[in-house]
């Protein structure tokens, strides 16, 4: 590590200093996090997605507007993404500068500290002042997670080694929460050791792998569009992609003639094989497709896709019968044997049945996807309220930062679930019209 960095030369640590008699924000001195992270290769991309340096200040004092001393204990959370840490001696000098300064109330002191520390750290800092009385019943709680201190392992090296982090970029997705009470860091100036407890929660590569997968899928979709539009790789696609939540569904309309499924390739093929059995297909066309409407020719009374799907079914499938194609009705116009004709007719009926069942299944999936999206939107609304609740409790000093962060993470997860559910709605809607061989007004 480069502990000879110029940013350390002006630090007051290790030097004789005078205590300030009045509040002075300029006493705070930053220490860049990059001094340690550069050597580990994690300055730009940290192998963790949540974390904070937590300080507890047991000696906070100031004067109220009448000059009466006030005391409190402060919990200070320095976000892991901040550019700087705050040098400990300058931190103590800064806190002691409050001793003879007047402030209106707890909130004024808390806001002042939070503003000053955030500017020094160049990142998010949360400060919570707690009255001393709060700690009368305060318990020492163990951090959640698996403690790794009691492992039966042999250690021979105590130096920094970036290779120990190489598994953080493996293809294996791992999620774990670890706790250790053996965290030790040496002061950059005096080399004195500081001990602490470290809690690490890792969600290794999950979000990053998902992002890569989505980018690959998008590139594949763009390739398809380029092929359709005959565009070269260096030519602009000139397509604006709207936010998925702004994409409106066309709406599924089942109030259309059943004959629409005749446009399906499988039904068309079966129809062609059957029609080729007739000596004169036009002679039977009026009875085969009355008014060129396949739905009016079905044995069921249904004339639309919507009503056909509500006819009694057996074993979960729609039963289709075409009496106008019976052998006794059309044998005078058939040029193949009865057995071959019956095979072609049954194949035709099965294709129609399969098509209607396909529409039915896809429409059910569409309605389920809509219900799922609606439920997830309600869940997300509740999660937003819960996050705000814990945020208010934290700002009021009655809840831990961890509880707020967990709630915020749950809210973000529900937001991602909504995006996926909207995508499923669009996919299932397209599947309905694909099974109907197109969109019909």
From Swiss-Prot:
Top-level taxon: Bacteria
GO cellular component: membrane
A Pfam family this chain is assigned to: QueF_N
InterPro entries on file: GTP-CH-I_C/QueF, OMF, OMP_efflux, QueF_N
GO biological process: transmembrane transport
GO MF annotation terms: efflux transmembrane transporter activity; transmembrane transporter activity
UniProt similarity note: Belongs to the outer membrane factor (OMF) (TC 1.B.17) family.
UniProt name for this protein: Uncharacterized protein HI_1340
